Curated annotation (Swiss-Prot):
ATP binds at residues 15, 109-115, 123-124. There is a cross-link at residue 82 (Isoglutamyl lysine isopeptide (Lys-Gln) (interchain with Q-Cter in protein Pup)). It comes from the Bacteria. One of its GO terms (cellular component) is plasma membrane. PANTHER family: STRESS RESPONSE PROTEIN NHAX (PTHR46268), UNIVERSAL STRESS PROTEIN UP12 (PTHR46268:SF6). This is Universal stress protein Rv2624c. Pfam families: Usp. GO terms for biological process: response to stress. Induction: A member of the dormancy regulon. Induced in response to reduced oxygen tension (hypoxia), low levels of nitric oxide (NO) and carbon monoxide (CO). It is hoped that this regulon will give insight into the latent, or dormant phase of infection. Keywords: ATP-binding, Isopeptide bond, Nucleotide-binding, Ubl conjugation.
Amino acid sequence: MSGRGEPTMKTIIVGIDGSHAAITAALWGVDEAISRAVPLRLVSVIKPTHPSPDDYDRDLAHAERSLREAQSAVEAAGKLVKIETDIPRGPAGPVLVEASRDAEMICVGSVGIGRYASSILGSTATELAEKAHCPVAVMRSKVDQPASDINWIVVRMTDAPDNEAVLEYAAREAKLRQAPILALGGRPEELREIPDGEFERRVQDWHHRHPDVRVYPITTHTGIARFLADHDERVQLAVIGGGEAGQLARLVGPSGHPVFRHAECSVLVVRR
């Protein structure tokens, strides 16, 4: 155990609850950990109290089984990453928010399956998106879908104070995932025929900083959620700022919900 005065190496934390989405989050977190040369820490939170020893045993057994399954999936990917596991006790949201103080990023699945895996989107993921002390990735579970040659990362250029950090994270993910970026921004729709010099300048400056990232600017005044609802582009990840965390449900959406056409869009909330 590290001494009080020794610095603690930050990790990529993944919330594990036994769901397919959590496995997806763990696999997604592997490249994040490797790229930063830090461990991948798989965390399965159990209840703070139990009405009986049998209930505790069931809860602990589920957590241990979930961690084994997640670790096996990560190891099967064949990538060299140090794996750590932990089973803390407490409400999942507050426990993971506190753990995020010592994390480079925290990754969670957006849906749960079964008795123990609750619907994370409505509780834990939302709490993390609003309160975590590091970026938060909310991952959709993968399903069989037609192959696509392009799997975009989408981000919006705004005048928000944290937008530059959001753009830098989008560029980092584009390099890591070898994906092109759709950059939304510019004038309102009714003025889209008029060139927006500021938007064009920011895109050009961004490209100069990251010449190896393919950036495709889209002039639109709509937000990411509305843009995705109106277009058919296949998007693997939307990158948003902490102040945009209220969009999370619209971007990720409940599984199979007819209103959310882009229910397979994962989200990275850039919190600092």
